[in-house]
């Protein structure tokens, strides 16, 4: 890499020669054309603070503050060296003994962009987890934290071997607003206020080693800030989208999870997004990067902002916000984009400085932030575990995490039972039934499909065919069709396989061929002719032959025809279940494990996605634009399956806990003037605990997932949302035949707040209901009295230059 570093340094005098007059139309093309060095995965090494050139510099003094140590290092750089290191692929400074560094690593649900070449034990396997959309469906905060903690242990082990960075471009905490979005699979789902915010907190603190850890484990990145949730719908590229978002929707839906990431989880990095919001590209938006992140959301003092890869260039092309590339680089650095994932800074800062648009101090500010993080990560502390316990982690430490079982558990806990007429769970072959099974559909023998996108390099991939074969079933496998084809050439083989089996399982839906980064769906109907094949399977089967359908993929498809087809005995959603996916899918069907997942997105009828523009970011319904309302909070139609839907193999009964109150009255002034020593803000104080007694009156042990919603028709401005999520929990293994468990979900003061048109989060007087699950099994009435109080004032949007430290 030393050669590559010198090569990049040599390019700097030619920076103006990189200008290209034949520009790609990124208003349509959704994949940026990045320079090769931006994509490098390099072999990492560490500065020598014992006897190297930096050993006498303050950066190697572990008693100094991270900021002072980083500033001392950066002060040694020449201007050319400083500019050369402003991209994600940093060549280092050879004369100072500062090694090359790669900022861009991935950890969405496993390590990505690591150096996976063969290296003995490290190459033996890397745990790869289910996609976030499936793990989140478990509604288990502890599980999310476990996954992130395991990934960070793995990341540190690879980092110590020089194969992975210390910063990760994860998690993706944009909300899955519109069902066509290709990257919704990377997110926890469509709820911002509670689910995605909780996911962000657990994932970030798992990655970083805690809230304020003594030693930072890895630096997480909250992405993509902000208003990013479309790839290429109707030829509108994510790179050029300029979306209109009201201050009310920004505050209520598009940013609260980022507030939690900054204020509560203390995330160390943010990524600004490709798109523009209200005319201003996110990476040159001082309102986003300074006013919101640093002044309002309490982003950590020396946290840094990275542009998405190619987004700084995008300020010029396609957004046209800057007149040329040097101006785009200047706009971005002055707005608060500290590091460019790309090469715009490296190639164009010389001209920006020459014209006076940027000063050295502006560049230093961002670079000091990055290196202050590396100081906190122990990058300059040598390889002794006494100075940093993470510097000694290796593959044996990864093996101790039980990662492989946790990956399986995440898949099992997230699978959602949508429909069941009593057919499931299947009797096992050992009971003399269902000895043969037909596995049909484009997911029936899935391996790489199981992973979704941005996956870690898995040690193994267990397909459904492999899993059922290993369990002693006689498997009749016939794909029958593909994800998007209309060819019926293989139907006959599938129908024959079904006739030969005791049980039919169809596994299909969507996959990364039609939902992915840079690729949205044009429809939310089942693609190709999969439904036609299922219909034929249903028509020919005998009455005592079970037909079960697994709907796979991150986004939802309209399964209404399956819901109402009596010959389809059961329907499940399986997401992207990861390396042990086949086992998880099998064990749910056979009853080895009981389903308790719930949908984190609404399953809409197919006509929903055709009724209004996917670029309409307004959540509230609007007759003029034919927007029927977006997400479970505002949708005015009838969903196929609602957000939070999920069935069990047993019967649960919920009732008010003994001695629990079902009515509360609170004075707003008293609430908001009370001391809150255990929380950052008064809004985070617990208002009351929602409690219920959960009894399993059925015949199977099972986990129980609880979603707690609030609604009002009197408090705050109209229109009123249908409801909104205020809390959730998962109770483990509630025993069958009368076993009970106590549910206790704290409801914070700000969970009952609403957002006004100016974007202020306000606690309004009025009557509220807080209810358990979509079925409203237990309802608590809450009345807030007195004058309304603003809990969080939304700042005025003013574009300008980000302030100094």
Swiss-Prot record:
GO cellular component: extracellular region
GO biological process: arabinan catabolic process; xylan catabolic process
Keyword annotations: Carbohydrate metabolism, Glycoprotein, Glycosidase, Hydrolase, Polysaccharide degradation, Secreted, Signal, Xylan degradation
A GO term, aspect molecular function: xylan 1,4-beta-xylosidase activity
Pathway field: Glycan degradation; xylan degradation
Glycosylation sites: 20, 115, 140, 235, 244, 350, 383, 405, 434, 445, 486, 490, 622, 653, 667, 689, 711
Signal peptide start-end: 1-17
Active site: 308
SUPFAM superfamilies from the UniProt entry: (Trans)glycosidases, Beta-D-glucan exohydrolase, C-terminal domain
Location in or out of the cell: Secreted
Reaction(s) this enzyme catalyzes, per UniProt: Hydrolysis of (1->4)-beta-D-xylans, to remove successive D-xylose residues from the non-reducing termini
Enzymatic class: hydrolase
Catalytic activity, EC: 3.2.1.37
InterPro entries, per the entry: BXL (IPR044993), Fn3-like (IPR026891), Glyco_hydro_3_C (IPR002772), Glyco_hydro_3_C_sf (IPR036881), Glyco_hydro_3_N (IPR001764), Glyco_hydro_3_N_sf (IPR036962), Glycoside_hydrolase_SF (IPR017853), Ig-like_fold (IPR013783)
PANTHER family: EXO-1,4-BETA-XYLOSIDASE XLND, SUGAR HYDROLASE-RELATED
Free-text function comment from the UniProt entry: Xylan 1,4-beta-xylosidase involved in the hydrolysis of xylan, a major structural heterogeneous polysaccharide found in plant biomass representing the second most abundant polysaccharide in the biosphere, after cellulose.
Similarity field: Belongs to the glycosyl hydrolase 3 family.
Protein's name according to its UniProt entry: Probable exo-1,4-beta-xylosidase xlnD
């Amino acid at each position: 890499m030393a050669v590559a570093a010198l090569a990049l340094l040599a390019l700097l005098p030619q920076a103006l020669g990189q200008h290209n007059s034949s520009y790609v139309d990124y208003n349509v093309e959704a994949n940026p054309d990045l320079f090769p060095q931006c994509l490098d995965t390099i072999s990492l090494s560490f500065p020598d603070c014992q006897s190297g050139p930096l050993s006498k510099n303050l950066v190697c003094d572990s008693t100094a503050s991270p900021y002072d140590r980083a500033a001392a290092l950066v002060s040694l750089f020449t201007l050319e060296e400083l500019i050369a290191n402003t991209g994600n692929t940093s060549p280092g400074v050879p004369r100072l003994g500062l090694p090359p560094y790669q900022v861009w690593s991935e950890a969405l649900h496993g390590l990505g962009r690591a150096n996976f070449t063969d290296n003995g034990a490290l190459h033996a396997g890397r745990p790869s987890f289910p996609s976030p959309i499936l793990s989140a469906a478990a509604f288990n905060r502890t599980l999310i934290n476990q996954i992130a903690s395991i990934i960070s242990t793995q990341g540190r082990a690879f980092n110590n071997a020089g194969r992975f960075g210390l910063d990760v471009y994860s998690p993706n905490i944009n909300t899955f607003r519109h069902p066509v979005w290709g990257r919704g699979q990377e997110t926890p789902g469509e709820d911002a206020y509670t689910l995605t915010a909780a996911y962000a907190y657990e994932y970030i603190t798992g990655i970083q080693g805690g809230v304020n850890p003594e030693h930072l484990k890895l630096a997480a990145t909250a992405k993509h800030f902000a208003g990013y949730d479309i790839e290429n719908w109707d030829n509108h590229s994510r790179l050029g989208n300029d979306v209109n978002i009201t201050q009310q929707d920004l505050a209520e839906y598009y940013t609260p999870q980022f507030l939690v990431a900054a204020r509560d989880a203390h995330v160390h990095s943010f990524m600004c997004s490709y798109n523009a919001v209200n005319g201003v590209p996110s990476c040159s938006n001082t309102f986003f990067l300074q006013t919101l992140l640093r002044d309002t959301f309490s982003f950590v003092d020396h946290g840094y902002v990275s542009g998405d890869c190619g987004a700084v260039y995008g300020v010029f092309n396609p957004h046209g916000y800057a007149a040329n590339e040097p101006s785009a680089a200047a706009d971005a650095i002055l707005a608060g984009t500290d590091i460019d994932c790309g090469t715009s800074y490296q190639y164009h800062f010389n001209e920006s400085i020459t014209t006076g648009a940027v000063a050295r101090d502006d560049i230093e500010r961002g670079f000091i932030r990055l290196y202050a993080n590396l100081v906190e990560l122990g990058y300059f502390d040598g390889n002794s575990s006494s100075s940093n316990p993470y510097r000694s982690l290796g593959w044996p430490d990864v093996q101790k995490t039980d990662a492989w079982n946790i990956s399986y558990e995440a898949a099992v806990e997230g699978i959602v039972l949508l429909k069941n007429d009593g057919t499931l769970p299947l009797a096992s072959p050992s009971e003399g039934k269902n000895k043969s099974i037909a596995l049909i559909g484009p997911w029936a023998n899935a391996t790489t499909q199981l992973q979704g996108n941005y996956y870690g390099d898995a040690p193994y991939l267990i397909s459904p065919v492999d899993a059922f074969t290993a369990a002693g079933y006689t498997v009749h496998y016939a794909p029958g069709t593909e994800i998007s084809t209309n060819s019926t050439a293989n139907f006959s083989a599938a129908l024959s396989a079904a006739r030969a089996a005791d049980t039919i399982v169809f596994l299909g839906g969507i996959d990364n061929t039609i939902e992915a980064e840079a690729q949205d769906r044009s429809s939310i109907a089942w693609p190709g002719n999969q439904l036609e094949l299922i219909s034929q399977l249903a028509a020919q089967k005998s009455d005592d032959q079970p037909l079960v359908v697994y709907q796979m993929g991150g986004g939802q498809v309209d399964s209404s025809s399956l819901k109402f087809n009596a010959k389809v005995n059961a329907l499940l959603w399986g997401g992207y279940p990861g390396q042990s996916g086949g086992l998880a899918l099998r064990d749910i069907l056979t009853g080895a494990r009981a389903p308790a997942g719930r949908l984190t997105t609404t399953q809409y009828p197919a006509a929903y996605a055709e009724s209004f523009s996917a670029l309409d970011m307004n959540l509230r319904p609007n007759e003029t634009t034919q927007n029927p309302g977006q997400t479970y909070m505002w949708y005015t139609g009838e969903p196929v399956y609602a957000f939070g839907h999920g069935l069990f193999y047993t019967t649960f009964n919920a009732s008010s806990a003994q001695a629990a109150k079902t009515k509360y009255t609170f004075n707003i002034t008293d609430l908001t003037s009370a001391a809150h020593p255990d929380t950052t803000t008064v809004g985070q104080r617990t208002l009351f605990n929602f409690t219920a007694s959960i009894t399993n009156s059925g015949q199977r042990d099972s986990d129980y997932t609880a979603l707690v919603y609030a609604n009002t028709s009197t408090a705050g401005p109209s229109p009123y949302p249908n409801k909104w999520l205020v809390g959730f929990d998962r109770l483990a293994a509630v025993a069958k035949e009368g076993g009970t468990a106590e549910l206790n979900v704290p409801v914070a003061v700000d969970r009952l707040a609403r957002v006004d048109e100016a974007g202020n989060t306000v606690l309004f007087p009025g009557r509220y209901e807080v209810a358990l699950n979509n079925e409203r099994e237990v309802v608590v009435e809450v009345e807030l009295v007195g004058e309304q109080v603003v809990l969080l004032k939304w700042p005025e949007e003013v574009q300008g230059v980000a302030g100094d430290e």
